[in-house]
Amino acid sequence: MSAIPITPTKRIRRNLFDDAPATPPRPLKRKKLQFTDVTPESSPEKLQFGSQSIFLRTKALLQKSSELVNLNSSDGALPARTAEYEQVMNFLAKAISEHRSDSLYITGPPGTGKTAQLDMIIRQKFQSLPLSLSTPRSKDVLRHTNPNLQNLSWFELPDGRLESVAVTSINCISLGEPSSIFQKIFDSFQDLNGPTLQIKNMQHLQKFLEPYHKKTTFVVVLDEMDRLLHANTSETQSVRTILELFLLAKLPTVSFVLIGMANSLDMKDRFLSRLNLDRGLLPQTIVFQPYTAEQMYEIVIQKMSSLPTIIFQPMAIKFAAKKCAGNTGDLRKLFDVLRGSIEIYELEKRFLLSPTRGSLNSAQVPLTPTTSPVKKSYPEPQGKIGLNYIAKVFSKFVNNNSTRTRIAKLNIQQKLILCTIIQSLKLNSDATIDESFDHYIKAITKTDTLAPLQRNEFLEICTILETCGLVSIKKTKCKGKTKRFVDKIDVDLDMREFYDEMTKISILKPFLH
């Protein structure tokens, strides 16, 4: 009989000086690993300045470029467009009161208020017909009018009389073929109870309009009319379509008023002059001139008058207006610049106001957030948006130009300061504006060629250089215990082109080394 193996027992350790055996240790319990949730209960805070932020309200106001109503006037004229408004209204009043066809051609560079002004006139001066026929004026309007026509309105003449009109506004960009404009006009006015017709040319549209002669005047506004010439079709067909539209607006058997709008200043000379079989066939022309800097400034101030405060410094608005007026006179471009400066200002101030700026580590960043960021409002930054923020926006527009082109616009003093800034950056790549100014003073004193500028004059030129896209100025946190913020300056140019241009000027050579 074989012996049953006995599992050996572990020898119990005893303390060296103990008489009794030591108490056997308790068996170790395995610890359960605790895994924390990857997804936190809430996500990191997201900075915002509140839904009623003055910044958000200002940007929204600048977005509505078509709503340039003079709040202090009920006549429907846009700011700085009173003369053009009166010309359009006189044209409409005469054509509608006489129940005759006529045409008007409105032209001008982009952003001069052509579309906005016509939209304003249509909204304010063409009123929908009242549903109730109880008033004598309504009965008089509808006595000889087909109420089933679409877009039917009434137009009040200067003497108080009401005239029946049907008005529509069409953007020609949406048209695939120029000849489809006739069908588009018909679809805008057709009798809801009438048959569906195919309108392919002027004669078809004329046949539809003639029964309403002396009863209802049809007013058609064609925006971007020159697009009819750029469609994917032959120039002959495009020109023919445009000529037929203006010819239709001169026929005595219909009451058809055509208002064409386009950016092309020479469209009348190139195409409409072919109508000149008789001087009476040519459309009346109104030119919307580019806005001046003063007009742009007044429009912006007027738009912002509804806000509790204006967040821009007056000089910043004037500077932006002058730059935009000098280029194209496009008011929409000015709105874009102002909105862009607000966004830059917000980003910078949010960074400065953030209490967690620079304190997050990788363990605090959620890997798979499932809830939207917690929004927390912070005090809105004090102060107003100045020239430096406007300059940052303009610098983006000119950065595509070559360094040589940008330098050519500078005067000798501005070129000299640019040279000293570059030299200060060679000594210290993190140079601030103050350090660059100190280097400038030392360089001027050493050469004894020109009188040094004051600090505020130096800063003004730095702003100009930033506007030209040659330097960039950023507010950064300086190193050390003070933790204060300074304005760091840097350059954005092609150094080879820079030296090629600067070495051509003998007085600047000492500042290049």
UniProtKB/Swiss-Prot annotation:
Per UniProt, subcellular location reads as: Nucleus; Chromosome
What the protein does comes down to: Plays a crucial role in forming the pre-replicative complexes. Interacts with the origin recognition complex (ORC) and MCM2-7 helicase complex leading to the linking of those complexes and loading of the replicative helicase MCM2-7 onto the pre-replicative complexes. Required for the initiation of DNA replication and then actively participates in the suppression of nuclear division.
Entry's family note: Belongs to the CDC6/cdc18 family.
| Record keywords | ATP-binding, Cell cycle, Cell division, Chromosome, DNA replication, Nucleotide-binding, Nucleus, Phosphoprotein, Ubl conjugation
UniProt KW Lyase keyword: no
- Modification after translation: Ubiquitinated by the E3 ubiquitin ligase complex SCF(CDC4), DIA2, and TOM1; and targeted to the 26S proteasome for degradation.
Induction context: Transcribed at the end of mitosis, but in cells with a prolonged G1 phase there is a second burst of transcription in late G1.
Q: How does it assemble?
A: Associates with the ORC complex and the MCM2-7 helicase complex. Interacts with CDC4, CDC28, DIA2, ORC1, and TOM1.
Positions binding ATP in this chain are G108, P109, P110, G111, T112, G113, K114, T115
Could you provide one GO biological process annotation from this protein's UniProt record?
A: cell division
Report the InterPro entries cross-referenced here: AAA+_ATPase, AAA_22, Cdc6/18, Cdc6_C, Cdc6_ORC1-like_ATPase_lid, ORC1/CDC6, P-loop_NTPase, WH-like_DNA-bd_sf
Write down the superkingdom of origin: Eukaryota
Q: Name which cysteines form disulfide bonds.
A: none
Q: Where is this motif: Nuclear localization signal?
A: 27-33
From the Swiss-Prot or TrEMBL record, give the protein name.
Answer: Cell division control protein 6
Organism, scientific name: Saccharomyces cerevisiae (strain ATCC 204508 / S288c)
Q: Any idea which residues bear Phosphothreonine here?
A: T368
What lineage, starting at the top, does this entry show?
Answer: Eukaryota, Fungi, Dikarya, Ascomycota, Saccharomycotina
Coarse class of the protein's main subcellular location: nucleus
Question: Which residues does the annotated region (Interaction with CDC4) include?
Answer: 1-47
Show the stretches that span the lipid bilayer: none
For this UniProt entry, the molecular function terms from Gene Ontology, in alphabetical order, are:
ATP binding; ATP hydrolysis activity; chromatin binding; cyclin-dependent protein serine/threonine kinase inhibitor activity; DNA replication origin binding; GTP binding; GTPase activity
A cellular component term, taken from the record's GO annotations: cytoplasm
